[in-house]
């Protein structure tokens, strides 16, 4: 596994990428920004490697993305209080966590 600086958030915090590669050369890239899966590179039938995931090459791309693309932890992770949420005028009850 390799770790490298990917970029910075809007408030200046470092974002790192973690690349994991297997023996055949396939690799994934993860970011510590929303637990983002940013890249999956696998071989095609001819053995040529290609990234098969729609991701971003820069932190600016990540910051401009408004739909949490690739993120396993969305924008409201650990931030819903009162065990409910309203979407498009409809109230939804959710299971209350330990602290929330």
What are these regions (language model features)?
Residues 1-100:
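Surface-exposed acidic/polar loop and edge beta-strand patches at domain peripheries
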